C-alpha cells in the first residue's frame, strides 16, 4: 500500500511538472492546451522533459504521394518532394534540442522515407510492429525502452496509431496531420501519454 502511494505521488508530481512546463511554453507560443484537450509540448518543453527521463516521440509520416497532386519523391507508395522538405525541416528543429535519439519506423515506404529525411543520416531501424495499432504498440514501445532505457526514441508510424493512443490514454480525439506527433514516456513498465508535440 505504501509503495502504491509513493508511486501515485510520484506520478502526480510528474504530472504537475508537466503542466507547469506546458503553461510556460504556452506563454511564449499559443496555448498550453490543444483544442483536442492534449497538452502542447514544443521543442524546448520536450528538451526539459528529456532531462527528467527518456522520451518517446511518435510522428505520423510526411505527405503521401498517392493522396497528393505534389511531385512524388520516387515510389508512388512513398512521400512527396514537399514531404521530404517538411521532414528535413522538422528533423533539424527537433535535433537542435534533442540530438541523441534512436530512430524507428514501420515497414512502409512512406514511414521509412519520412524517417530517413528527418534524421539526415542517423541509423534507422525498421520495425513492422509500428504498422499495427492497439495494445501491441505499447508492448513494442516498452520493448525498445527495455533494450535502451536511457535513450530517447523517435518512431515514424501512422495516423490511426496516433489516434488510437490519444483516445486510449487520454480519451482525446486526435486527428493528426502529416508529421504531427505525440510525446510519451515509460515509467515502471507502463506507457504514459504526455501530450501533443508542436513544432515551433
Curated annotation (Swiss-Prot):
InterPro entries associated with the record: His_Pase_superF_clade-1, His_PPase_superfam, LipoPS_heptP_Pase
Signal peptide start and end residues: 1-25
Localization, UniProt: Periplasm
UniProt main location, coarse: periplasm
Keywords for this protein: Hydrolase, Periplasm, Signal
EC number of this enzyme: 3.1.3.-
Top-level taxon of the source organism: Bacteria
Any GO MF annotation of the entry: phosphatase activity
Pathway info: Bacterial outer membrane biogenesis; lipopolysaccharide metabolism
Keyword Metal-binding appears in the UniProt entry: no
Enzyme class of the recorded protein, top EC level: hydrolase
GO biological process: lipopolysaccharide metabolic process
Gene Ontology, cellular component aspect: periplasmic space
Keyword Disulfide bond: no
NCBIfam families: PRK15416.1
Function of the molecule: Catalyzes the dephosphorylation of heptose(II) of the outer membrane lipopolysaccharide core.
Family the UniProt entry places it in: Belongs to the phosphoglycerate mutase family. Ais subfamily.
Protein name: Lipopolysaccharide core heptose(II)-phosphate phosphatase
This protein's encoding gene: ais
